[in-house]
């Protein structure tokens, strides 16, 4: 009887020690992976910051930004509230702090502000067969009797066992 108790006791100790060692092992792997990911993301940010030139305080703004400034002054809306996330004393400080990641800043700097002129809608009298407003009949398939179909958990487990639903063609 003493040997049976000793065997159970040994088994419990082995199980507890193995669980503790597994937890330590997973914690160490998690720590090493997080440091590796932080190092890689730091390298990516450094590479991106080297590629993106920082705008100088006397940076020339595109015409669309000037127009937006004019419309905002007409409406008496403060510029810092609409363009920048963080309040600061100088515009260059708020520009640097408003965009924490360089790729997002790069995306806004590379925008081409060209003037787009739309043609008059009267000139576009194109009666193409693909015009969605001129389609006389369109077909769509809808479920005829949705109340008859009872949801079942097994449809998600095995789609081959699902019963087919009735569909009918409807003209719109």
Curated annotation (Swiss-Prot):
Region spans: Disordered: 52-106
Keyword Zinc found: no
Composition bias type Basic and acidic residues, residue spans: 64-89
Biased composition, class Low complexity, residue ranges: 91-103
Induction: Up-regulated during erythroid differentiation.
PTM annotation: Phosphorylated. Phosphorylation on Tyr-132 and Tyr-141 occurs in a erythropoietin (EPO)-dependent manner.
Keywords, comma-separated and alphabetical: Cell membrane, Differentiation, Erythrocyte maturation, Membrane, Phosphoprotein, Transmembrane, Transmembrane helix
Membrane topology: Single-pass membrane protein
Any GO BP: erythrocyte maturation
Xref: PANTHER family: REGULATOR OF HEMOGLOBINIZATION AND ERYTHROID CELL EXPANSION PROTEIN
Subunit structure: Interacts with EPOR; this interaction occurs in a erythropoietin (EPO)-dependent manner. Interacts with JAK2; this interaction occurs in a erythropoietin (EPO)-dependent manner. Interacts (via tyrosine-phosphorylated form) with GRB2.
Name assigned to this protein: Regulator of hemoglobinization and erythroid cell expansion protein
Organism (species): Homo sapiens
Native organism taxonomy: Eukaryota, Metazoa, Chordata, Craniata, Vertebrata
